[in-house]
Amino acid sequence: MKSKLLNGATLALFLGAALTLGINTSAYSAERTIHIAGFGVKTGVVRSFGINTEAVLKAAILHINSTGGVKLADGATGKFKLTFYDDRCKAEEGISVVRRIAGTAAVIAIGPTCSNVAEPLFGILQKKRGDASDSGLQMPIFTDTAIKGGLAKISDWAFRNVPNEANMYKALFKWLRTEHPDLKTVFGGVEQDFAHSRFTWHKVMKVSAPAAGYKLVGEAKWLLADTSFTTQVRAMKKAKADIISISSHPFTTCGLLKEMKRQRVKPKLIVGLTSSSSMETLQGCGKAAEGIIIPTSFAPVTDAARFAAAKTAEQGGSTDLHSASAWENVMIVKQVIEANGIEAKPDTVQADRGKIRDGLAALKTTKGLIGTIKRTAEGEADKPFVYAHAKNSQWAVLHDPAK
């Protein structure tokens, strides 16, 4: 009887210990969903940018989820779940989308594509973190594409991982002046009704070229939906500039380049807009674009960049300076979640958003696909870049200014 009682007590202790062990380990084996929202343009002339961003986000999330997921504050494993919204590159729709996202379980939103959406959208966010008198949305937005200069400073909740075009074109024109000292004049062309194109010509290219010693001999303007460029190219032909600097997106860039070829306008060099360093440009007018030079913050020059490009291709997308930022954004969000005690529970959504915002604001550097990215106090990025040129309907690295 004593032996039986002892065995029973031992069994009870064993079961109690096992139960306790099970309870303690369950927190570590549990899996939670971390909701992420993506948004951008998937309709209209520039829809390829949003489509590629969605493909990259899917690829990056699949990679993380299939390689261990994300470690949460209590040791549980988190798996990302993406919901992507089309804002149609319209400010009012972008604002509506983000208000909708704020009412979901998403802890962060990655987007938008268009600067004309980002600028007013950032304006509806709380301007200063912790300001009780400001009823603006307290939702971290981490932009991958909208590139117009200086937008992140609008709100403490706005962050961007986009290249600094002012630095890129300043360096490019200075380098071109050294490499081609015989070239003296520049003619500019701009997609006047698109915020990014307009800003980059008037505030960046038009400033950087004369600063490097070039003489500006004229400019031409057109609209995003234009299909005829006869008049603009005639003006280029008349100016006889050594360099044509084009600030427009792939659709109108190709239209312009084809018209230049038709009118036999052959400048010594053509400089393009960052956003046109994409496969869409080469697919639309590879022969006409031959030789165009564009600064870009993405090229498949590292193992990480090639890996991201391959995984994106599996999702039906292509990787360029915009969509590559979306991959980096997901990796940065994972890093911030793991370092800042995110719980990913239904009752911690707003607290998690605040922790992610604070974590992003605290970053000084992040790991990029082609090198280290510096973070600024205003929530912007200072990204490494190279000069790419179109060669045989492919993008090739012409020069790496870091080397």
Model-derived segments and spans:
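Extracytoplasmic "Venus flytrap"
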Residues: 37-60, 85-91, 190-200, 318-324
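An alpha-beta-alpha
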Residues: 42, 154-221, 243
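Beta-alpha junction/loop-to-helix N-cap segments that form part of ligand/metal-binding clefts
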Residues: 48-55, 70-151, 161, 222-229, ...
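Hydrophobic alpha-helical segments within soluble ligand-binding/sensing domains
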Residues: 94, 160-185, 229-230, 253-254, ...
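Periplasmic-binding protein-like
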Residues: 101-114, 134-144, 186-190, 240-250, ...
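Extracellular/periplasmic bilobed ligand-binding domains
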Residues: 123-131, 201-297, 399
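Extracellular/periplasmic periplasmic-binding protein-like sensory domains
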Residues: 260-329, 339-340, 390, 395-402
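Segments of small-molecule ligand-sensing domains
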Residues: 313-323, 334-399
